[in-house]
Amino acid sequence: MDKQQEFALRTVEERDVRFIRLWCTDVLGTLKSVAIAPAELEAAFEEGLGFDGSAIEGMTRVSEDDMIVQPDPSTFQILPWRGGPQGTARMFCDILTPDGEPSLGDPRHVLKRALAKAKEKGFTFYVHPEIEFYLFENQTDWSKAPTPIDEGGYFDHVPRSPGMDFRRATVNMLEQMGISVEYSHHEAGPGQNEIDLRYADALTTADNIMTFRTVVKEISLERGIHASFMPKPLADAPGSGMHTHLSLFEGDSNAFYEAGQEFNMSLTARQFAAGILHHAAEICAVTDQFVNSYKRLWGGAEAPSYICWGHNNRSALLRIPQYKPGKGNSARMEFRGLDPVANPYLAYSVLLAAGLDGIEQQMTLGEPTSDDVWELTDAERQAMGIEPLPDSLDAALKIMEKSDFVADVLGEHAFEYFLRNKHQEWDEYRGQVTPYELKKYLPKL
């Protein structure tokens, strides 16, 4: 038994923890949970816990349904919202076959596999997400437009605002769980908020994002309001994204930094960026996986609709921040295409793999875009070689299903299930008769 397992067992006993929740996600990024009693924890570390894998989206086929959930003791934390004298803890888990092999449908394993390839090349992949979400008043009929809890705007200080208190409570709870937060503030939309997690390796950050979503939902329930990570909940307000800052380190050195080069970008950084732009359309269905995601991408308000990069250009898909231009360890690039309901394990897998492919293939990064890409004409964008991202889930899926690259990164099992599920979602959406159609056409047609 290793020290992390011993720590978890000792803490459970000393803190009188009565339930240990074992967390994992399905292929779509939905959190799954099973609770075990303290008496079962040691056996769970040694042998795992059996479950029906076919009952979880994309995990396995019915004919191969016996699977094992194996807790990762390094992720052990007490859940603050389940406090009291008899508390609850949680751990993230890896999914294994009865033979002890990683499940092909486990998103956490997909990311571990991508990180292992980076490690073989001497790289550690760090990410830093800026997570946006809306706070609405509770309502019973969600077919009607939601009501934001305030009318604040970007960086607004709203005295005695429920949103300000909400952010404070969220940050405090995250830090109780060992999740460091850099910033929190009101965003541009009414009732829209942003909380930025401190950078960490991609696997830790993906786990933290799943915890973050749960914390936000728990606090909203306690306070009688509704928190939503929906990418575009309001037609006339900015959508919610999850802009993510990316960096590669070689040991203690930032591989993206080279003093004296344009924007202090090393050749490694330029090739990594070129790889992401090269594969951007192929991976779009993974980074933006819902029908609603494309209403954010194509809704303006600094959303990135076109495949380009720029220095301090928030209309670009990939931005090179220059907050601290002379500080090597701060060198990074910001991918602005992600939304907050992406499966973080799969999203970070395809982003890392795309960047590494750029390095392996020695791809050349084109010229940066300084213009607001939305203000350019189609002819101007074409002359500059700027291509659009897919404008719908359907368009994104048609590109992804032809991609050997994405199939290789996700693995055929997860790749095929993801496509099948998302094609079904598009078919369901396409078959709807919307309120817009009824209002516009029914009276006169």
Enumerate the predicted regions with their spans.
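Glycine-rich, acidic/polar active-site loops that bind/position phosphate-bearing ligands
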Residues: M1-L445
